[in-house]
């Protein structure tokens, strides 16, 4: 059984930055450090940080006065940000800069009095945070997930519309929704640069190449990870059996016993240690040494907040 690895896979710059912010805060200030929502959607990462003293909460009211609070990589609404400001808290923002870019687009539309349409998944924390950047009572903010949704919404002024997208969507699905938006609202204005982030796009491109060669595709990522789910769905759309797994323990021998080639990739919030454990498990089931496919090189780095960088050097 051949083992193929997608390239690129695993951590993106935004996830690296978010985890570093929590780790640095723990190293500098000591436990406990409060984090609003899971800092990234990966069970292994969250459990590891929890063991070191991170406390994950959903409501600002759960954070005691004087504590340190970190916003997750998914971003928060202005209401949440304002609530935190009203408290005696030290706040660090781990929002991915590429999510912040979308926040700025929404805020700009709100200031201009444009109505805004967000393409995204209802209930996802990134969507909640992005929708929460719109505050113009004279306008409106709408959420759509599919081309069908586009034809159901009612706007006030079809000539003063803009759209944005969640950063972790399926590139193909989003393209269909954008086509529907442009068809229904010919004057709608989109972002100058795609909102779907480079890491999401690159990992979907990589899983396409992987699925062309593999009989079975294993996607390492947690069930609540949007970008990981999109990778599994893409492989399935290409006619391949695909499984979303948290770790190597999820792999069932029956999944791969008749496979000549098993492909492995990982969502943007899944650490490489989990991929290595999957390779070890597959080898135990008869797999050969893993071979990595060629793919796009990623050199993007997002710095942690200045305060944490300075404090981190002092600690060292």
Swiss-Prot record:
Identify the InterPro entries for this entry. LytB/IspH
Stated EC number for the protein is: 1.17.7.4
Residue positions annotated to bind [4Fe-4S] cluster are: 12, 96, 197
Is the keyword Oxidoreductase assigned to this protein? yes
Q: For this protein, what does the record note about how its cofactor is bound?
A: Binds 1 [4Fe-4S] cluster per subunit.
Q: Which residues form the active site?
A: 126 (proton donor)
Q: Which UniProt keywords apply?
A: 4Fe-4S, Iron, Iron-sulfur, Isoprene biosynthesis, Metal-binding, Oxidoreductase
Pfam families the record matches: LYTB
Q: Which cofactor does it need?
A: [4Fe-4S] cluster
List residues binding isopentenyl diphosphate: 41, 74, 124, 225-227, 269
Give one GO molecular function term. 4 iron, 4 sulfur cluster binding
Residues the entry annotates as binding dimethylallyl diphosphate: 41, 74, 124, 225-227, 269
Biological processes annotated in GO: dimethylallyl diphosphate biosynthetic process; isopentenyl diphosphate biosynthetic process, methylerythritol 4-phosphate pathway; terpenoid biosynthetic process
- Kindly tell me the pathway this chain contributes to: Isoprenoid biosynthesis; dimethylallyl diphosphate biosynthesis; dimethylallyl diphosphate from (2E)-4-hydroxy-3-methylbutenyl diphosphate: step 1/1; Isoprenoid biosynthesis; isopentenyl diphosphate biosynthesis via DXP pathway; isopentenyl diphosphate from 1-deoxy-D-xylulose 5-phosphate: step 6/6
Q: What class of enzyme is it?
A: oxidoreductase
Q: Which reaction does it catalyse?
A: isopentenyl diphosphate + 2 oxidized [2Fe-2S]-[ferredoxin] + H2O = (2E)-4-hydroxy-3-methylbut-2-enyl diphosphate + 2 reduced [2Fe-2S]-[ferredoxin] + 2 H(+); dimethylallyl diphosphate + 2 oxidized [2Fe-2S]-[ferredoxin] + H2O = (2E)-4-hydroxy-3-methylbut-2-enyl diphosphate + 2 reduced [2Fe-2S]-[ferredoxin] + 2 H(+)
In terms of CDD domains, this protein maps to: lytB_ispH
Q: Which PANTHER family match?
A: 4-HYDROXY-3-METHYLBUT-2-ENYL DIPHOSPHATE REDUCTASE
* UniProt subunit comment: Homodimer.
**What the protein does?**
Catalyzes the conversion of 1-hydroxy-2-methyl-2-(E)-butenyl 4-diphosphate (HMBPP) into a mixture of isopentenyl diphosphate (IPP) and dimethylallyl diphosphate (DMAPP). Acts in the terminal step of the DOXP/MEP pathway for isoprenoid precursor biosynthesis.
The UniProt family comment states: Belongs to the IspH family.
Q: What is this protein called?
A: 4-hydroxy-3-methylbut-2-enyl diphosphate reductase
Provenance organism? Cronobacter sakazakii (strain ATCC BAA-894) (Enterobacter sakazakii)
């Amino acid at each position: 059984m051949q083992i193929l690895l997608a390239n690129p896979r695993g951590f993106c710059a935004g996830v690296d930055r978010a985890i570093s912010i929590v780790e640095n805060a723990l190293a500098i200030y000591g436990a406990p450090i409060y984090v609003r929502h899971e800092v990234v959607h990966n069970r292994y990462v969250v459990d590891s940080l929890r063991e070191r003293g991170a406390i994950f909460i959903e409501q600002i009211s759960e954070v005691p006065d004087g504590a340190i609070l970190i916003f997750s990589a998914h971003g928060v609404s202005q209401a949440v940000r304002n609530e935190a400001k009203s408290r005696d808290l030290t706040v660090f923002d781990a929002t991915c800069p590429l999510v912040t870019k979308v926040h700025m687009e929404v805020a700009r539309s709100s200031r201009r009095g444009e109505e805004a349409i967000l393409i995204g998944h209802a209930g996802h924390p990134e969507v909640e945070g992005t929708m929460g950047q719109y505050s113009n009572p004279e306008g409106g903010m709408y959420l759509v997930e599919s081309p069908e949704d586009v034809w159901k919404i009612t706007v006030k002024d079809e000539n003063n519309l803009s759209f944005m997208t969640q950063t972790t969507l399926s590139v193909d699905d989003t393209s269909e929704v954008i086509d529907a938006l442009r068809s229904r609202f010919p004057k709608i204005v989109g972002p100058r640069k795609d909102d779907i982030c480079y890491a999401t796009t690159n990992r979907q491109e990589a899983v396409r190449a992987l699925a062309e060669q593999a009989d079975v595709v294993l996607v390492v990522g947690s069930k609540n990870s949007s970008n990981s789910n999109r990778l599994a769905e893409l492989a399935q759309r290409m006619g391949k059996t695909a499984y979303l797994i948290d770790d190597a323990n999820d792999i069932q021998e029956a999944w791969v016993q008749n496979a000549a080639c098993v492909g492995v990739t990982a969502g943007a919030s899944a650490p490489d240690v989990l991929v290595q454990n999957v390779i070890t498990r597959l080898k135990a089931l008869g797999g050969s040494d893993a071979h990595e496919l060629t793919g796009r090189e990623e050199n993007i780095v997002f710095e942690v907040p200045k305060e944490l960088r300075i404090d981190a050097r002092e600690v060292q």
